[in-house]
């Protein structure tokens, strides 16, 4: 599970930490300054569809893209960018405090079911299982995009050339003299260090934890670590000096971007809402997401400006003039 998509804290404990923020969101939904008990029937002022993101730039970018597309379809929208970690956003969705969240298939399913019982690299199977898991809260899973953001095993170009590395299985002959850098929770996540041991037989010489993805990128470039776990759409992968190794034994789950929407919002806005999000998903690719992440995270572009530009390039929003 990507560090950009998970906090590493136990779900129940983190939920308790997030309760004040949920109460504030409920107050915003009710249009008053007082907290209200969150409930499935809460609605945004004016019937606006609330589109929320997790607290990292790529999620904000996706929420802005979907939100602007929905607004262009004539539906009132309120964007809640950087709402918080998964432990806040998931309960807010379940309780009807937000209406649309751009999710990641595998991570969303693992949040709800610790043992999903499906072949996780299969997007169709993961989507069906996620739909079943969200059904009790009347939340529907829309059509996934081709775009994915998975855990990626990354080395510098110099290391790849020196050791002849192209795919993750190539590391097996050299891992014993290499240091891996990852998020603190990598030691426990099934798709991180335990999975690399079990599926690929990798026994690294050492492991160094880093709290943020930029710290791991810096450590990799400076030679503090030899291998790093990064998101496959990390904007730094577009700079040319880092190499993403192919997951040739399919350790990582399907992590297609997929909008999840409350049944209440779909009942109110029907085909207009579904059509708006499906139009985005039909054209969103991993390469496009990588480029936009580079623009936002490395080049310093604004999230909303980049979202607007992507929608214009793909004919969803009209170009100016």
Mark where each language-model region is.
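A bilobed periplasmic-binding-protein/Venus flytrap-type ligand-binding module shared by bacterial periplasmic
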Residues: 151-161, 256-269
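An extracytoplasmic/periplasmic, membrane-proximal ligand-sensing/linker region
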Residues: 58, 185-191, 197, 202, ...
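Bilobed "Venus flytrap"/periplasmic-binding protein-like clamshell domains
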Residues: 46-78, 146-218, 222, 301-305
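C-terminal motif of bacterial Sec signal peptides marking the signal peptidase cleavage site
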Residues: 24-27
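Paired acidic/hydrophobic, glycine-rich loop segments that form the ligand-binding mouth/hinge
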Residues: 99-103, 225-231
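Bacterial N-terminal signal peptides that target proteins for export
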Residues: 1-18
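Ligand-binding "clamshell"
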Residues: 112-122, 127-142, 222-224, 236-250
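Bacterial signal peptide processing site
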Residues: 29-32
């Amino acid at each position: 599970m990507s560090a950009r998509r998970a906090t590493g804290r136990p779900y129940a404990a983190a939920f308790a930490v997030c309760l004040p923020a949920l109460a504030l969101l409920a107050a915003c939904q009710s249009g008053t300054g007082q907290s209200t008990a969150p409930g499935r029937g809460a609605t945004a002022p004016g019937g606006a569809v609330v589109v929320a993101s997790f607290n990292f730039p790529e999620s904000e970018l996706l929420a802005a893209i979907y939100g602007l597309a929905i607004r262009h379809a004539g539906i009132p929208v309120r964007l809640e960018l950087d709402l918080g970690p998964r432990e806040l956003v998931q309960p807010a969705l379940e309780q009807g405090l937000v209406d649309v969240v751009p999710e990641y298939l595998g991570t969303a399913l693992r949040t709800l079911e610790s043992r999903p019982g499906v072949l996780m690299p299969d997007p169709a199977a993961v989507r069906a299982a996620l739909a079943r898991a969200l059904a009790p809260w009347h939340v529907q899973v829309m059509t996934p995009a081709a775009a994915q953001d998975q855990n990626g095993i990354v080395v510098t170009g110099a290391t790849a050339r020196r050791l002849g590395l192209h795919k993750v299985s190539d590391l097996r002959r050299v891992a014993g003299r290499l240091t891996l850098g990852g998020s603190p929770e990598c030691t426990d996540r099934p798709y991180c260090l335990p999975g690399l041991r079990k599926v690929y037989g990798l026994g690294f010489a050492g492991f160094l934890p880093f709290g943020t993805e930029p710290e791991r990128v810096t450590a990799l470039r400076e030679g503090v670590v030899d291998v790093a776990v990064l998101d496959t759409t990390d904007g730094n992968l577009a700079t040319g000096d880092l190499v993403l190794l192919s997951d040739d034994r399919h350790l990582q789950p399907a992590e297609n971007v997929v909008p999840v929407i409350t049944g209440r919002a779909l009942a109110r806005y029907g085909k207009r809402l579904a059509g708006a999000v499906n139009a985005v998903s039909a054209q969103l690719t991993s390469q496009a997401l990588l480029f936009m992440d580079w623009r936002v995270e490395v080049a310093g572009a604004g999230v909303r400006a980049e979202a607007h530009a992507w929608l214009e390039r793909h004919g969803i929003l009209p170009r100016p003039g």
